[in-house]
Amino acid sequence: MKLHHIGIAVESLAAARPVFEKMLGKSADAEEVVEEQKVRVAMFQVGESRLELLEATSEDSPAARSIAKRGQGLHHVALAVEDLAGKLRELENAGVRLIDREPRRGAGNELVAFLHPASTAGVLIELVEDK
């Protein structure tokens, strides 16, 4: 298992992207809309990991609810796993509360699933199937 990316919820990609581009000394490596999660994301490769900026595309998206509750900032930590479906079964059997019981498509068309913060010390954890 390794760190895949850190997700940061922002009110506006147009406002946040230039700040991160200046800080990182590079443009975003990718930008896309993830319809299922109702977000627009900009991804920056940083060493062996990534920073993902998330902007809600709908007021009822998880990112919009997160910003309304906690403001902009850390949204989730994503970890790469080899067998996502197997890891979800293992964690559920161990009593970890899952948001997603089955993998779904996320940014970059990767298979992802989220663990509930109630089981992970208050941090939203995303598991990403390692390619």
Predicted regions and their residues:
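Long, hydrophobic N-terminal alpha-helical segment
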Residues: 1-37, 61
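Short, structured motif recognition centered on aromatic/hydrophobic residues
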Residues: 3, 20, 44, 51-54, ...
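Vicinal oxygen chelate
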Residues: 3-11, 42-45, 64-131
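Hydrophobic side chains in well-ordered alpha-helices
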Residues: 16-19, 87-91
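Intrinsic, low-complexity N-terminal interaction/targeting segments
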Residues: 34, 53-65, 98, 103-114
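C-terminal "cap" of GNAT-fold acetyltransferases
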Residues: 34-50
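Short, charged/polar surface micro-motifs in flexible loops or helix N-caps
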Residues: 47-51, 58-60, 84
